[in-house]
Amino acid sequence: MALTPKQRKVRRDYLTRKKRTLQQQGASNAEIKAFMGGRWNFAGMSDKALERAYDEIKSKGRTQVFGNHVYTSDYVKKAKAWYGDKFSVEKLTQGFRSSQRSELNRFHSVKEVKEYRSERDREAKERYIQALEEMHYNTRDAGNKAQEKAFKSMISRIRRMSASNFGAFLTGGRSDKVSFDNVMVFVDTDGKETAFEFQDSLAREILDNVDKFSKQFVSDMRRRKKRGKK
C-alpha cells in the first residue's frame, strides 16, 4: 500500500531527526550508519524501503551515546544490571554492531539479568563451599586442630554471605590482592553446561587468604553502609 505524502514526510523527518540527534550527541557517522541499518540518505527511497527503515529504527527504542558509539537504552540497562556497581563505559562492547551480538541480548529484560546473576552467584557459592569441604576432608588427617577450627570458621563465614555478596567476594576489587584472580567460576543456569575450575596449585594459598579476605569484605561492607547513611 502506497504512503500518502504526509505519511512519507513523517517517516522521512523522523529518520533524519534521529540521525541529526545522534550526530549532536557525538556519535560517529560510521556508528550512526550502522545503527540506521546502513542507510544515510532518506530522500528518494521507495515507500516500501522508507516504511521498513522507519519501523526498524523506531523499534530499537531510545538510544544513548558513549564516546562516539551508539547503544540502545535497553542494552545499556542490561549491561548496568549485569555489572552492578562495577559498571563503567569501558565495560560496554565497542560499537553498535558489537552490542547487537552481545550475550546480554539473550535476556529479555533487566529482571532476567538480575535473576540470572542471582542464580549464578548462588550456584557458585554452593560449588565453592563444596570444593573447600572436599579439600578439608582430604587434609584433615594432618591432625592440626587449630587449622581445622579456622577452616570451619572460614566456611561458616562464607555460608552466612548472601549469594550476591559472595559474587562480590569472589570477584571483587580486592580479589587480586589475595590471589583469587586465578580461581574461575562459570555457571550456565540452563543446565546444559556447568563448569567449576578449582586449581589445586592455589589450594594452600587460598586457605591462607580466604579468612583474611572475608574479614576485609565484611569490613568494607560496613564502611560502605556507614557512608550511605550520611
Swiss-Prot record:
UniProt keyword annotation of Transmembrane present = no
Any one of the GO BP annotations: DNA replication
Compartments where located: Host nucleus; Virion
Identification of the protein by name: Terminal protein
A GO cellular component entry from the record: virion component
Q: What is the lineage of its organism?
A: Viruses, Duplodnaviria, Heunggongvirae, Uroviricota, Caudoviricetes
Top-level taxon of the source organism: Viruses
The record's keywords, sorted A to Z, are: Covalent protein-DNA linkage, DNA replication, Host nucleus, Virion
Q: Where is this motif: Nuclear localization signal?
A: 222-230
What this protein is reported to do is described as: DNA terminal protein is linked to the 5'-ends of both strands of the genome through a phosphodiester bond between the beta-hydroxyl group of a threonine residue and the 5'-phosphate of the terminal deoxyadenylate. This protein is essential for DNA replication and is involved in the priming of DNA elongation.
For this UniProt entry, which residues form the secretion signal?
Answer: none
